[in-house]
């Protein structure tokens, strides 16, 4: 799903939901994984044809691209959301739009998650999260962004989502 809005100040907001991709990271065995990769290819093609200017991209991209975006890079390397093929597809989208990962621009080195499984009984102690939710800015406005934060504590609320809010400040 892709929803875009042009604001009165000339900023375009793109909100994406990238399909989760099922449980098996194999295009031939898992139609959902194939659909996810095809969707990412369509995103890439869209941004090659429509170069983003004065744009923000937000959403659940269902990919944790960096080793610091998952609780254990080696254990997660064959798990949907952190496989190399997904990471490569997401990087191609990022290159196509010349997007800057605002959250990682602000918080470059530490483990950072926006999602924890409902299956984890003690999600906070085990801390087996993933950073699936992203905020990107087009290169022309990326320097106007900052103050990124992820509200981890929201995951501990009564009846929470498995995702938590991700914020950034954009001064334009």
Language-model features: locations:
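Active-site regions of metal-assisted phosphoester/phosphodiester hydrolases
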Residues: 1-172
């Amino acid at each position: 799903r892709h929803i875009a809005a042009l604001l009165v100040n000339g900023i375009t907001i793109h909100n994406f939901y990238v399909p989760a991709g099922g449980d098996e990271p194999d295009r031939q065995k898992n139609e959902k994984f194939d659909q996810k990769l095809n969707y990412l290819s369509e995103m890439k093609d869209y941004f090659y044809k429509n170069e983003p200017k004065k744009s923000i991209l937000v959403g659940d991209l269902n990919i944790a691209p960096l080793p610091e975006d998952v609780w254990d890079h080696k254990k997660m390397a064959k798990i949907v959301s952190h496989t190399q093929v997904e990471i490569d597809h997401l990087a191609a989208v990022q290159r196509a739009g010349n997007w800057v990962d605002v959250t990682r621009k602000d918080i470059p080195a530490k483990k950072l998650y926006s999602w924890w499984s409902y299956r984890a009984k003690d999600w906070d102690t085990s801390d087996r999260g993933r950073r699936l939710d992203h905020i990107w800015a087009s290169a022309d406005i990326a320097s106007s962004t900052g103050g990124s934060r992820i509200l981890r504590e929201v995951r501990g609320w009564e009846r929470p989502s498995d995702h938590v809010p991700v914020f950034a400040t954009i001064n334009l």
